[in-house]
């Protein structure tokens, strides 16, 4: 391993990178023990709905409760969250996903699904509640790029998009407060423009004289499944949620009738892939 530079302009550049890490680490250590125990009790005492009950309508209040707990208790481990994916959250998720995209391997379009939306979502909700939900393979197609090259595109089936959107909403409210301030990708209220603005401000404040531009090649395709699940368990120790994520990770890819599987990578085109990649990268940086 190369030695870390210790002098001159390079040292100033390293200080800039570590500034966000050190600041956020100190923030994570200010949690009140009393508040942590209260929140832990609330989370552990949450229970799934009983069989035979009608679809639960929460109006998003479940996510608000989870977010408040996560805000005030950055080390809290949530043990029961998968049941928050109820009928109402599924319906909200359907409204938020892009409707213009192509159909997946089941050939069901958003327009067709919406013709009997409540019944379709109720059936989906029942399969989730009974543990009968099965993730479908992602359909892979290739599109042209400049220069004559082609790029693979993954198209999940509509129901997988809906459930992934709901699960991603839960994971985001739990993990987002832990992410570093210098992390901008796929986060609500953040953008490339904000990243550039923050970088400029840090450069002016700390007299930064150099910047490294780097890209992680094939990030989504090379995330180790077991490591990812271990990282998620640090905040979400819910077997139901972990199994649900595992179904998407192991669903495989369908290309021209051939089904293939991989032990690495998040779902191609998956709505949940961005938050999974953020969790993974945050854990790598944190150590």
What are the residue ranges of the model-derived segments?
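Amphipathic alpha-helical blocks
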Residues: 112-135
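Glycine-rich active-site/cofactor-binding loop and its immediate structural neighborhood
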Residues: 145-156, 160-165
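Conserved polymerase palm-domain catalytic core
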Residues: 127-142, 146-147, 178-190, 194-287
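Duplex nucleic acid-engaging cores and interfaces of nucleic-acid transaction enzymes
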Residues: 158-168, 210, 229
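Conserved aromatic-histidine-acidic binding/catalytic patches
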Residues: 82, 112, 155, 159, ...
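Short alpha-helical scaffolding segments that buttress acidic/His motifs in well-ordered protein cores
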Residues: 93-97, 166, 244-249
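Electropositive, glycine- and tryptophan-enriched low-complexity nucleic-acid-binding patches
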Residues: 164-165, 169-184
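Non-catalytic, polymerase-adjacent accessory regions of viral genome-replication enzymes
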Residues: 1-107, 111-118
């Amino acid at each position: 391993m190369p030695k870390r530079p210790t002098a001159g302009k390079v040292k100033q550049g390293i200080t800039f990178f570590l500034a966000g890490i050190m600041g956020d680490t100190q923030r994570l250590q200010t949690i009140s023990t009393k508040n942590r125990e209260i929140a832990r009790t609330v989370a552990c005492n949450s229970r799934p709905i009983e069989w035979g009950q009608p679809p639960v309508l929460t109006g998003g209040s479940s996510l608000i409760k989870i977010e408040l707990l996560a805000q005030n208790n950055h080390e809290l481990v949530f043990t029961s969250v998968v049941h928050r994916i109820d009928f109402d959250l599924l319906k909200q998720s359907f409204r938020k996903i892009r409707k213009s995209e192509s159909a997946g391997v089941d050939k069901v379009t958003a327009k067709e699904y919406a013709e009997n939306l409540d019944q379709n979502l109720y059936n989906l909700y029942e399969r989730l509640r009974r543990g009968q939900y099965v993730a479908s393979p992602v359909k892979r197609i290739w599109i042209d790029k400049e220069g004559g090259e082609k790029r693979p595109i993954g198209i999940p089936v509509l129901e997988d998009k809906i459930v992934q959107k709901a699960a991603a909403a839960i994971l985001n409210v739990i993990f987002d407060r832990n992410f570093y301030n210098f992390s901008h990708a796929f986060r609500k209220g953040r953008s490339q423009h904000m990243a550039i603005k923050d970088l400029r401000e840090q450069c002016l404040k700390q007299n930064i004289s150099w910047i490294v531009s780097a890209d992680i090649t094939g990030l989504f395709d090379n995330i180790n499944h077991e490591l990812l699940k271990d990282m998620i368990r640090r905040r979400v120790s819910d077997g139901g949620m972990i199994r649900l994520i595992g179904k998407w990770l192991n669903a495989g890819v369908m290309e021209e009738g051939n089904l293939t599987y991989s032990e690495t990578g998040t779902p191609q085109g998956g709505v949940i892939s961005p938050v999974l990649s953020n969790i993974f990268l945050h854990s790598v940086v944190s150590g």
